């Protein structure tokens, strides 16, 4: 029992010692990741119902993400637009770095059009507001540390054109 307590304490201390990377204590960091589709995101922001920026991000309620993008690939629509989400936590026994959070496939190969992406996604320069509802994954979210830095990788894949676009975001997240 004492060994378990010592290990748990070390994990907590190593996570706390790392702090918030890349300014995530005060702001959302995002970038466009690996992409084969002709889609370019120029803004990504977490917003409330009035369209005002919100930070930190709460994963205990639906997350509204306002984006601006230029889609030169083609129209994306159901059932061919798929979404995969990967989560990463910062810190832990491996030191101050990002490590994958196991989701056991629950966040893989989801129908993007029923999971918050307004479909069809038209061709052209446009604003696109997505609502990602993490509450349906409470079994995963409840295991995450509260008020901690997390990295979210959101990948949208189009099965018609066999292309994909990835958005990466690092944020201070609330899980309680």
Please place each PLM-identified region on the residue numbering:
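N-terminal onset of structured domains
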Residues: 13-117, 121-176
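Cleavable N-terminal signal peptides of Sec/SRP-targeted secreted and luminal proteins
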Residues: 1-16
